[in-house]
């Protein structure tokens, strides 16, 4: 069973040098797609005991819990380092995640995180402006309908990475 929560799958031997590389890739894709379709991510999240390591871990868990509680259609993570977006991603909630960052390197890294739509954003002068554009980016990136709830999380823009301390519920 493929329930180990990985964002990526890699085939090395058979796909690179084996006799049946196309079949190997096709089979792995079918298994992964089947597993994704038949996994109840919300139940898994709600029924798993959570033990947070630090405040960032706890905030990431709270974001996911809040997204489910308010029936949010998206979570937007404003992240300099990408760490918060990756932590939110690991909880596998059935809510789309937009990972906003100003760093092209982090933007590329977020594309490998489960359920994350990475968005390369400009730097914003303050948190209020960042939150405004976060909601707008989610609406554009995910084609959200008017009235949809969005959870936005981030931290002070002047401090750099690792300072996520805010969670906000917005309505598109």
Regions found by a protein language model. Name each.
Residues 131, 136-153, 157, 164-170:
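C-terminal binding/interaction regions
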Residues 3, 7-8, 29-41, 68-72, ...:
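Generic secondary-structure signature for well-ordered alpha-helical cores
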Residues 26-29, 87-95, 112-116, 137, ...:
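Short, solvent-exposed amphipathic alpha-helical segments in soluble enzyme
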Residues 84-86, 92-129:
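Nucleotide-binding motor/catalytic cores of P-loop/tubulin-like NTPases across gene-expression machines
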Residues 15-37, 167-169:
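C-terminal helical cap(s) of enzyme catalytic domains, especially alpha/beta-barrels
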Residues 2-21:
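Glycine-rich phosphate-binding active-site loops on the catalytic face of alpha/beta enzymes
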Residues 27-64:
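Long, charged amphipathic helices and adjacent flexible linkers at domain junctions
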Residues 1, 88, 150:
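Conserved, mostly hydrophobic/aromatic
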């Amino acid at each position: 069973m493929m329930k180990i929560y990985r964002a990526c799958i890699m085939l090395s031997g058979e796909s690179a040098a084996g006799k049946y590389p196309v079949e190997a890739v096709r089979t792995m894709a079918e298994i992964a797609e089947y597993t994704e379709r038949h996994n109840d991510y919300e139940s898994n999240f709600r029924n798993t005991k959570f033990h947070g390591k630090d405040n960032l871990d706890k905030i990431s868990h709270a974001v996911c819990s809040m997204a489910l509680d308010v029936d949010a259609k998206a979570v937007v993570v404003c992240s300099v380092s990408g760490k918060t977006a990756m932590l939110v991603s690991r909880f596998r909630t059935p809510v789309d995640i937009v990972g906003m960052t100003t760093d092209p390197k982090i933007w590329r890294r977020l594309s490998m995180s489960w359920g994350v739509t990475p968005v390369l954003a400009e730097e914003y002068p303050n948190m209020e402006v960042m939150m405004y554009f976060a909601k707008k980016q989610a609406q554009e990136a995910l084609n959200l309908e008017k009235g949809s709830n969005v959870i936005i999380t981030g931290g002070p823009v002047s401090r750099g990475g690792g300072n996520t301390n805010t969670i906000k519920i917005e309505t598109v």
